[in-house]
Amino acid sequence: EFRKIRSQNQNFINLCLNSKLSSKITLQPIERFDLDSAIIFSDILMIPYALGQNVNFVKNGGPKLDEFNLDLFLNNDERKFTRILDPIYEAIKITRNKLKKNKSLISFVGAPWTLLIYMLGIKKNKEEIDLVKLNKFDSQINQIIQQLIKYICVHIKNQINAGADVVQVFDSWAGLIPKTKIKD
């Protein structure tokens, strides 16, 4: 079922921003297996996308983000961010209304460091990051992290207000944080 929808919607970001299809995909496992919870169909990289960084998903290659632009990133506002992600919140509302009351609706976000690693394009592989690239942003890391925290919180709040029962924070690349940065 999902593969059919996906094959008809090549742009993954646009699929995530299609409220009706996102809800339909979310509900497929519930309808088929009567699970206890549904997980909203979305992606952790919707935050960088809403903050102005182009995100593409390359077949058999994973996500590819355009080069990070600090000025663009820092010059965002909550209204624009929320407006871009409104279709996700609408998908949550639609799904919540279609779910039985005894079923939980789970949504999610990426944690600051995980998003930062994707946004700066510094992941070499599953076990290391490009420290040379990271060091290019050394003086701005705290500022970038604080901005990410702000928008992650906005996204969490909006998802809860839309009807999510639980919001999972994925910190997929926390183990790649250099020890020198953990204190910061």
Regions found by a protein language model. Give the residues of each.
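Active-site loop segments of alpha/beta catalytic cores
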Residues: 84-184
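Pocket-flanking alpha-helical
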Residues: 49-52, 95
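N-terminal basic, low-complexity leaders that serve as flexible interaction/assembly modules and, when applicable
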Residues: 1-50
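A short acidic, glycine/proline-enriched capping/turn motif at secondary-structure boundaries
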Residues: 44-47, 62, 112-114
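Short aromatic-enriched loop/helix-cap "lid" or pocket-rim segments at secondary-structure transitions
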Residues: 2, 51-53, 118-120
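A gly/proline- and charged-residue-enriched helix-loop-helix capping module
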Residues: 60-98
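Short glycine/proline- and acidic residue-enriched helix-loop micro-motifs
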Residues: 9-11, 71-80, 134-141
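A charged helix-plus-loop insertion that forms the helical arch/lid used to bind
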Residues: 55-70, 125-131
